[in-house]
């Protein structure tokens, strides 16, 4: 809003001459301030120019009103202003009137919708300068600002005034017609260097008309027009910059850092004050809601305007956290309660340990995707990517969350799900996010709230969003109402973490549940979560979930905006963790010995890809190494946990371990892993369990809340209860192995580690298993259960089980260490094992390899879409009993390259000879590219002197299907044609595969050129490829090259007309080996059909000609069929 000082009565302005003089007019006292001035003949520019030239000595002082301790409005203040306007009817009406006035004054291009009565709502109390008098008369030559109905009808040639120049404490913004001349003086030289005493530095937004010929701007080319003072950003470096193309309506921006003193052109204070607009409620900033703030200026990055601390976005190690609580004093501060809550929340998260025992080894975060599903089910499964096509999230958690902010629409909630198996470190990863925010590595968020999902399984319907953020977590947060109001105004700067999503009850209906639309309405916790997932509550926030996937994902997870998986430790990361563990324990002398113990147990080494199990191995190794040099780790997972709990059970109260096992089982039945202190049967049991580390307080949890330190420990204790309990009938025990699906089972296998531990506890020798935990009396009670399970396992037929159940059976048999069961399982394995689409973890690959070696027969493995790691693939391929295998092309080529680099010639030769791709179906562009890499590998080998011969996979390929569809098909087909001649044994080329590839005439022409090299081709399927007469002509020209081999030719459902039919009829007698030809659903007429029928009579070798098409009269087709029965109309 312009801040103008009306001239006192009796002033005169000179007549304009050219473009620099003003018309002579008499100005009397103006009453009503802005409104009368707008309707008067006074030109504000001339008025100010007149004051600039006149001697003000002896005149009444005119003072610009300035509020002390004010600043330009920022985004947070403006948001509060809007919220208060919405709640106050009078304020909302007043600001609506001001908005109409602003639109009338400044937005000239939108005058069509305004009228004179926009001022009728402004009362006398809102009129500025009401004590001033109206002029008696105005000059006839002055122009009033016309109202819309007074404007000419043709507004096309009407040009709005140039945008005003804006000068801030650090910025000067304005239109510049010619910026070739840079200012020769520092920017303060444009104004008074030494303002008069008593004058205030401008702290509000003012606009002062400046003539272009002003001497003070002689070195800076600015057009005539108003200059606006906005003292805002003071963090820019000293200097003056010009930024072109700054934004709409501004041709240039001049940025200057430094104090801007009072302008010399402003008249000294007078007897009256020109008041500003009403100050907006709860806002210490500018007196005008339309004054631009720092956030309104172009080219300013958001973090520089909204970050509450001096934070850096680059990576910071957990041990090098900057001072997170240091708040910039150059930015507008939050209210004191918000600042205090912000600091306390940072202190809370920053005090949490980096990992178990303070050890942190970061695991890889992999982008996940869902399987394509043609069913209508809302639940979908995770796809299993090949090892080579995994997409790692570069930059870790910070990059994931930064990308989430960049790719979402404004005010749109972003849901991110991080998935992982039990023990992969999801909860520690979620804690790492909170610590990263506390250390200043996530400046895009003002607040982070981490809530374990087990805290949300509470009854009642009187909860609100404020309870979810502050009260329902493990440790309630103290926050004033002002903090909650601040959060609601900026939800896009809030990160909410829900850890352990699998522990929520009825988690599959959040997207369809009803919830209150307003945050203040109380509802159930389920309603609150539904409001978050339906993006009605706290809309615009980032919602981060961690969950353990079990089969199909519920819709709340499958509909997430981004999916990631924790891949666990690699072999190198596991060994690094072992080294750091013993280093932190002060036992560096045992580091090498511990690694040797681990390498001697390949199963435990493969299980160490799980951070939880890797830590358990380190704990047991530490205990064994303290006993002596002859220490050895157990060979099974059951033995690992027996070793960990055996020492704790030695000095336990009577029955304490059994009571703890029962408690773990009951919690697992309810999908829970946390418990209260009063749930223990006695205080002695609780004290013992806490002292031995079997239960512990979760981070930031209440004193009465306890949890098992790992999910696998809970599974082991649950299996221990099943092995000891007399409450479970023996005949029901096999159901808990979960190897054969049943419609009714006692539990849903939520404790997914129970089957393996149960087999190990029951079948392993009692002296080193149950007897070591509970004594000889407990071991005697499992004899009957052992017989029941042995009978059940020996009746199973491994060849009838699904791949996942077969792997679980192998794990159970391995844990049992019972020779009869192991021999039965491995000898019943089928010769062809397919794990297509079933994920193979490192322990799966190890147990499978042991079973294949013990079987004593040859096997063919299908390892496609299993995500098997390179070391696991190499170990299986290297087995002598594996004669053939299929795996992802990219993984196999990478394995060959690795073996060649390491000089493993024999293993490389075996891997090349055993690999097959028969049959091969290309369903994506990546499949075609991988096939091209395979052919390129063969060509490289052929040109090398030390190797010779074709790759068996390329040489023996007989069937190739191309099914990319109409979008990718035309793009990928030329790449396939270029490598097609490498498959010398190709017999079946299917370019239909129930998908319209639409290779067209161009594709047929390219394919025809390869026919002379495809000597073995017997079946050619070109159906549904948009082939016309031109394509049929090209095909007919090249078909004689296949005369000796081609048996079946299909051109079903193309666009072949009579000319194309004639071309095919002409070549048909030359195809001496052809037996079946299909030209149904084309566009040729009776003439084309008759030519084909006539040619067929000269081809006694052809058995069937399918040629029904709707363009031929049925009577003609029937007549042709009567003449030759080989014509098929079906």
Curated annotation (Swiss-Prot):
InterPro entries: Leu-rich_rpt, LRR_dom_sf, MHC_II_transact, NACHT_NTPase, P-loop_NTPase
UniProt-listed Pfam families: LRR_6 (PF13516), NACHT (PF05729)
Domain of life: Eukaryota
Location within or outside the cell: Nucleus; Nucleus, PML body
Primary location group: nucleus
Binding site for GTP: 420-427
CDD domains: LRR_RI
Keyword Protease appears in the UniProt entry: no
E.C. number(s) listed in UniProt: 2.3.1.-, 2.7.11.1
Variant or mutagenesis effect after changing residue 561 to A: Strongly reduces GTP-binding and abolishes transactivation at MHC promoters
GO CC, one annotated term: nucleoplasm
Domain called NACHT: residue spans: 414-724
Span list, region Disordered: 269-303
UniProt entry tagged with the keyword Transcription: yes
Keyword field: Activator, Acyltransferase, ATP-binding, Disease variant, GTP-binding, Kinase, Leucine-rich repeat, Nucleotide-binding, Nucleus, Phosphoprotein, Repeat, SCID, Transcription, Transcription regulation, Transferase
Disease: MHC class II deficiency 1: An autosomal recessive immunologic disorder characterized by the loss of expression of MHC class II antigens on antigen-presenting cells. Affected individuals present in early infancy with severe recurrent bacterial, viral, fungal and parasitic infections, usually affecting the gastrointestinal and respiratory tracts.
Function in brief: Essential for transcriptional activity of the HLA class II promoter; activation is via the proximal promoter. Does not bind DNA. May act in a coactivator-like fashion through protein-protein interactions by contacting factors binding to the proximal MHC class II promoter, to elements of the transcription machinery, or both PubMed:8402893, PubMed:7749984,. Alternatively it may activate HLA class II transcription by modifying proteins that bind to the MHC class II promoter.
Record remark: domains: The acetyltransferase domain is necessary for activation of both class I and class II transcription.
Name assigned to this protein: MHC class II transactivator
């Amino acid at each position: 809003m312009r801040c103008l000082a009306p001239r006192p009565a009796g002033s005169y302005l000179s007549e304009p001459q050219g473009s620099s003089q003003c018309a002579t007019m008499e100005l009397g006292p103006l009453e009503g301030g802005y409104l009368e001035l707008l309707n008067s003949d006074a030109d504000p520019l001339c008025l100010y120019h007149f004051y600039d030239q006149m001697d003000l000595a002896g005149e009444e002082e005119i003072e610009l009103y300035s509020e002390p301790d004010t600043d330009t409005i920022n985004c947070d203040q403006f948001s509060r202003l809007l919220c208060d306007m919405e709640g106050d009817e009078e304020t909302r009406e007043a600001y609506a009137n001001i908005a109409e006035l602003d639109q009338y004054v400044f937005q000239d291009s939108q005058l069509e919708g305004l009228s004179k009565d926009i001022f009728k709502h402004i009362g006398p109390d809102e009129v500025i300068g009401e004590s001033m008098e109206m002029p008696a008369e105005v000059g006839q030559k002055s122009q009033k600002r016309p109202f819309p109905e007074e404007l000419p009808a043709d507004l096309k040639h009407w040009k709005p005034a140039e945008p005003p120049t804006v000068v801030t404490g650090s910025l000067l913004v304005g239109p510049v017609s010619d910026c070739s001349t840079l200012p020769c003086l520092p920017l303060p030289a444009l104004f008074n260097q030494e303002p008069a005493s008593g004058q205030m530095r401008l702290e509000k937004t003012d606009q002062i008309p400046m003539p272009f010929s002003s001497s003070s701007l002689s070195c800076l080319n600015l057009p005539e027009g108003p200059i606006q003072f906005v003292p805002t950003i003071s963090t820019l470096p000293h200097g003056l910059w010009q930024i072109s193309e700054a934004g709409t309506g501004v041709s240039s921006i001049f940025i200057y850092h430094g104090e801007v003193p009072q302008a010399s052109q402003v008249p000294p204070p007078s007897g009256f004050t020109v008041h500003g607009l009403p100050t907006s409620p709860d806002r210490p900033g500018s007196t005008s809601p339309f004054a631009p703030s720092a956030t309104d200026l172009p080219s300013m990055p958001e973090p520089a305007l909204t970050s509450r601390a001096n934070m850096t976005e680059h990576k910071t190690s957990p041990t090098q956290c900057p001072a997170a609580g240091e708040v910039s004093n150059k930015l507008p501060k939050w209210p004191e309660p918000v600042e205090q809550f912000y600091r306390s929340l940072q202190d809370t998260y920053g005090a949490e340990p980096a990992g178990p025992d303070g050890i942190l080894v970061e695991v890889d975060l992999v982008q996940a995707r869902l399987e394509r599903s043609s069913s209508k089910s809302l639940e979908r499964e995770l796809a299993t990517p090949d090892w080579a096509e995994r997409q790692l999230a570069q930059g870790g958690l910070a990059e994931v969350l930064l990308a989430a902010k960049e790719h979402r629409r404004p005010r749109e909630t972003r849901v991110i799900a991080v998935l992982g198996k039990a023990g992969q470190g999801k909860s520690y990863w979620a804690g790492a996010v909170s610590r990263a925010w506390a250390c200043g590595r996530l400046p895009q968020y003002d607040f982070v709230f981490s809530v374990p999902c087990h805290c949300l399984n509470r009854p009642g319907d009187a909860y609100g969003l404020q309870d979810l953020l502050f009260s329902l977590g493990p440790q309630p947060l103290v926050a004033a109402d002002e903090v909650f109001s601040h959060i609601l105004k900026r939800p896009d700067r809030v990160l909410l973490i829900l850890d352990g999503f699998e522990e929520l009850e009825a988690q599959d209906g959040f997207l369809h549940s009803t919830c209150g639309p307003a945050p203040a309405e109380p509802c159930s916790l389920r309603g609150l979560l539904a409001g978050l997932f339906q993006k009605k509550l706290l809309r615009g926030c980032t919602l981060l979930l961690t969950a353990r996937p079990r089969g199909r994902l519920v819709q709340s997870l499958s509909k997430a905006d981004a999916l990631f998986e924790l891949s666990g430790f690699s072999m190198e990361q596991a060994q690094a963790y072992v080294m750091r563990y013993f280093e932190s324990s002060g036992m560096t002398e045992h580091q090498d010995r511990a690694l040797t113990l681990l390498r001697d147990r390949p199963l435990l080494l493969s299980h160490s890809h799980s951070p939880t199990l890797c830590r358990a191995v380190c704990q047991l190794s530490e205990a064994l190494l303290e006993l002596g040099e002859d220490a050895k780790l157990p060979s099974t997972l059951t033995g690992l946990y027996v070793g960990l709990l055996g020492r704790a059970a030695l000095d336990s109260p009577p029955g304490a371990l059994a009571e703890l096992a029962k408690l773990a089982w009951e919690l697992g039945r309810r999908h829970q892993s946390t418990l209260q202190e009063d749930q223990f049967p006695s205080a002695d049991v609780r004290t013992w369990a806490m002292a031995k580390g079997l239960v512990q307080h979760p981070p930031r949890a209440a004193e009465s809340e306890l949890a098992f330190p790992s999910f696998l420990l809970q599974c082991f204790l649950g299996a221990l209860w099943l092995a000891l309990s007399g409450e479970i009938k023996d005949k029901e025990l096999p159901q808990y192995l979960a190897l054969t699906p049943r419609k009714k089972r006692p539990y849903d296998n939520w404790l997914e580690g129970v089957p393996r531990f149960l087999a190990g506890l029951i079948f392993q020798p009692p002296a080193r298993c149950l007897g070591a935990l509970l004594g000889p009396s407990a071991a005697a009670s499992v004899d009957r259960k052992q017989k029941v399970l042995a009978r059940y396992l020996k009746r199973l037929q491994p060849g009838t089980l699904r791949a996942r159940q077969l792997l679980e059976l192998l794990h159970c048999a391995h844990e049992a260490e019972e020779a009869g069961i192991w021999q039965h399982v491995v000898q019943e394995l089928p010769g062809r094992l397919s794990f297509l689409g079933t994920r193979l973890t490192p322990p799966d690959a190890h147990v499978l390899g042991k079973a294949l070696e013990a079987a004593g027969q040859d096997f063919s493995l299908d390892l496609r879409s299993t995500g098997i790691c390179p070391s696991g693939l190499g170990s299986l391929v290297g087995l002598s009993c594996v004669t053939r295998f299929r795996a992802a092309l990219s993984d196999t080529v990478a394995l060959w390259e690795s073996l060649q680099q390491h000089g493993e010639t024999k293993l490389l030769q075996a891997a090349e000879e055993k690999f097959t791709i028969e049959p091969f179906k290309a369903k994506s562009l990546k499949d075609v590219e991988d096939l091209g890499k395979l052919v390129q590998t063969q060509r490289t080998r052929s040109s090398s002197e030390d190797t010779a011969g074709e790759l068996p996979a390329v040489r023996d390929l007989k069937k190739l299907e191309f099914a990319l569809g109409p979008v990718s098909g035309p793009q990928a087909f030329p790449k396939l044609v270029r490598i097609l001649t490498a498959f010398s044994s190709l017999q079946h080329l299917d370019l239909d595969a129930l998908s319209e590839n639409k290779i067209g005439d161009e594709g047929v022409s390219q394919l025809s050129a390869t026919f002379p090299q495809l000597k073995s081709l017997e079946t050619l399927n070109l159906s549904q490829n948009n082939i016309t007469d031109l394509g049929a002509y090209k095909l007919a020209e090249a078909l004689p090259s296949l005369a000796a081999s081609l048996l079946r030719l299909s051109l079903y459902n193309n666009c072949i007309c009579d000319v194309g039919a004639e071309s095919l009829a002409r070549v048909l007698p030359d195809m001496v080996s052809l037996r079946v030809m299909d030209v149904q659903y084309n566009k040729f007429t009776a003439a084309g059909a008759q030519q084909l029928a006539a040619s067929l009579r000269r081809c006694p070798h052809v058995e069937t000609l399918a040629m029904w098409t709707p363009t031929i009269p049925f009577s003609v087709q029937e007549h042709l069929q009567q003449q030759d029965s080989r014509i098929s109309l079906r």
